Amino acid sequence: KEGYIVNYHDGCKYECYKLGDNDYCLRECKLRVGKGAGGYCYAFACWCTHLYEQA
């Protein structure tokens, strides 16, 4: 499963400005989803990969 990560407080996606491989997105995805997650910047928001099915 894949998808954007959102802020639980306001429901907004995590913004990013460097498209493609992005250390910020990778770090945020791993923090919120787990060590096996991947992440990159897609359409100026952080996109996470390898999410659990219940995410």
Swiss-Prot record:
Keywords: Disulfide bond, Ion channel impairing toxin, Neurotoxin, Secreted, Toxin, Voltage-gated sodium channel impairing toxin. GO terms for biological process: defense response. GO terms for molecular function: sodium channel inhibitor activity; toxin activity. Beta toxins bind voltage-independently at site-4 of sodium channels (Nav) and shift the voltage of activation toward more negative potentials thereby affecting sodium channel activation and promoting spontaneous and repetitive firing. Coiled coil: none annotated. Belongs to the long (3 C-C) scorpion toxin superfamily. Sodium channel inhibitor family. Beta subfamily. This is Beta-toxin Cn7. The keyword Protein transport does not apply. Has the structural arrangement of an alpha-helix connected to antiparallel beta-sheets by disulfide bonds (CS-alpha/beta). Residues 1-55 form the LCN-type CS-alpha/beta domain. It comes from Centruroides noxius. Expressed by the venom gland. It is found in: Secreted.
